Structures are given as structure tokens and as C-alpha cells.
Curated annotation (Swiss-Prot):
Cellular component, GO annotation: cytosolic large ribosomal subunit
Organism: Thermobifida fusca (strain YX)
GO biological process annotation, one example: translation
Stated family: Belongs to the bacterial ribosomal protein bL25 family. CTC subfamily.
Assembly notes: Part of the 50S ribosomal subunit; part of the 5S rRNA/L5/L18/L25 subcomplex. Contacts the 5S rRNA. Binds to the 5S rRNA independently of L5 and L18.
Name of the featured protein: Large ribosomal subunit protein bL25
The organism's place on the tree of life at top rank: Bacteria
GO molecular function, one term: 5S rRNA binding
Name of the encoding gene: rplY
Function: This is one of the proteins that binds to the 5S RNA in the ribosome where it forms part of the central protuberance.
InterPro entries given in the database record: Rbsml_bL25/Gln-tRNA_synth_N, Ribosomal_bL25/Gln-tRNA_synth, Ribosomal_bL25_b-dom, Ribosomal_bL25_C, Ribosomal_bL25_long, Ribosomal_L25_dom, Ribosomal_uL5_bac-type
Amino acid sequence: MSEVRIAAEPRTEFGKGAARRARRAGKVPAVLYGHGIAPRHINLPGHDLMLALKTPNVLLRLEGVDEKESLVLPKSVQRDPIKGFLEHVDLLVVQRGEKVVVEVPLLVKGEVGAGGVLNLEMAQAEVRAEATRIPEGIEVDVDGLPIGTNVTAGDLKLPEGVELAMDPETIVMSVVAEAAPEATEEEEEGEAAE
């Protein structure tokens, strides 16, 4: 789990115009909430935040919000639908040692058995882990799995200290037979002539 330090500054202006001015200045408007505190509005440096959010479930250490640093998890990220720029972020305050529920990407390793194709039902699994020990991904070894095999959430090998937070019977991936190739027009015409 990676921790990234980001300097935050309190936001005093609100509304669409203020948010646009902040974005033009290279800042991203954000709201900080959780642990019984009143929601606080802050601005974060856009470039630093963009780089930090490239890591799944990154833990941010905000400086400049309180006397002490705040540990937060990005809960909701809004992006421009065309350009992909960050528009707004909701941040959840967490404590060291506190368990949180997050979605962790599944990392497929290996090749399925001959004639099979891996059908990925879910790209992420919901797990409960300490805020400072969230895994970056869960490896799933599919090497040599035969056709008809289902991998359920309960089959996932979770790191120490991480618990499953979803139904263990949920199918996350399965091995199916390859689809037969469609016949070309020439082959169909040849069969029809016979």
C-alpha cells in the first residue's frame, strides 16, 4: 500500500464559478468527510493528485488541513467525460489500524487449459483490510484450469490481514470453450453446391 503526501489548502469560495477558477489555477476541488467530522471543502494540487490516483486504493496523507496530517482514501473521483481531467474528488478520512471496505483489482496469472478461454465476470473483488495495508491487487493463478471451471470469490487467496467483504459464492471468473470459427462465404457456397 502506498502513501502519498499532498499539500491541501482550505477552500473558502463555493459554487460552479469558484470551482472553475480553482481548476484553471491547477487545483482540484475536494470534500473531506468521515469519522463524525463536518464535511470540509479543500483544494488539492491537480498534477500531484492525478499522479497519486494512478495507484489503485492509494492512501493520501493531507498536509495543511489540520494541525496534524489527515489520512484519507479517495471515495469518488469525477472526471471530465471528454478530456479526462479531474473535476472533483470525495475523500474519506481513515485512521491507522481501521478496517475499510475497498475494491481491489484481480490480477490474472497463467494460461487456461487447451481449448479454453477465460471469461472474467468481475475485474475487482470487495475486501476488508486495514487502511494502511490495502493490497494493490489479488493474484489469481488460472494456469492449466480445464473448461467448465469456475473461480469463486471464496477461492481467492487473500494476503494476511485481508478478509473477503462479498459473498464467497460469487463467481469472479470461469473457463469456457472457445467459440467455433464462423464459416466463410466460400465454404458455405461449397457446401451448398454439394
